[in-house]
Amino acid sequence: MLVHQGAGAAETTTMKIQIEARGKKWTISLENNETARALYAKLPLTLDMEDLYGRELCYRFREALPAREVEMRGYEIGQVVYWPPRHSFVILYRQNGEAFDMQSVGRVESGIDELAQLGDAKARLTRAE
């Protein structure tokens, strides 16, 4: 979970992204790592998300994001990851048992079943309040 400390040491907030597509909204809680911070710094963004392999929504950035904690592993439904070989921002909505090199970025808080039905879509990503 990515935490931002405000002016007072006791003031902390979890950094979150709101995704809006086809009139629906979802929230992603970010992890505390360099990749999540770099993604958050790019917001707001409008991305053409592709529905790939029957398991994920994906957008490929032109430029790489920093990713120094990449590991080969399996994933959980609702996990949000960065796949370095193709600079891919990925939301995983269905399990197929595959393991691959990934940098974990965060997690969709709720509504992953609705997100799985989205298909290819234009999505607006903003900083959640």
Language-model segment annotations:
Residues 11-60:
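N-terminal secretory signal peptides
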Residues 65-69:
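Short alpha-helix capping/helix-loop boundary micro-motifs
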Residues 6-8:
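Cleavable N-terminal signal peptides
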